[in-house]
């Protein structure tokens, strides 16, 4: 791992009996991406997250994919969420809120999020195919559950249109990337203040504010 140039950076190494996941996220990057999870479709979506969110992203993962992709998919989501939380710190000076509507051909997906420290996922994708290639469509939701619970994001995902499963999921990741980019960017008018009337936004796992 060696492409990081970001000032706000999170590094997580998660090891279990099922997986070994190393994640490095740079919030102030330019979309450099080096990802290898052993789950090809997940890699493709993580590239979308990096490219459209302008996140520098390095991920390596090994897991029990000979059984299925569930553990690797979930543990990558956990580590990505933890790395985002670490990089955001006390969330001082950020815009905090983000939203985007992304099209991909016939698919249209809206994402609205809040870097609130209060994890919540409202998931509204209706993916018609059970699998996209070899990737179980149910794992899309499981990935976002893991990210949300470990990053402290409030995340709403709405599918406005779409019939092609690949298009729906890719539009979702692109919308998430752009909404996240909007939320985590530094707001110069904040002058480094925490974007909350309470004066504090806790990291994931702390007391909610």
From Swiss-Prot:
It comes from Prochlorococcus marinus (strain MIT 9313). SUPFAM superfamilies: Ribosomal protein S5 domain 2-like. Its main location: cytoplasm. One of its GO terms (cellular component) is cytoplasm. GO terms for biological process: L-histidine biosynthetic process. This is Imidazoleglycerol-phosphate dehydratase. The keyword Amino-acid biosynthesis applies. Belongs to the imidazoleglycerol-phosphate dehydratase family. Keywords: Amino-acid biosynthesis, Cytoplasm, Histidine biosynthesis, Lyase. Pfam families: IGPD.
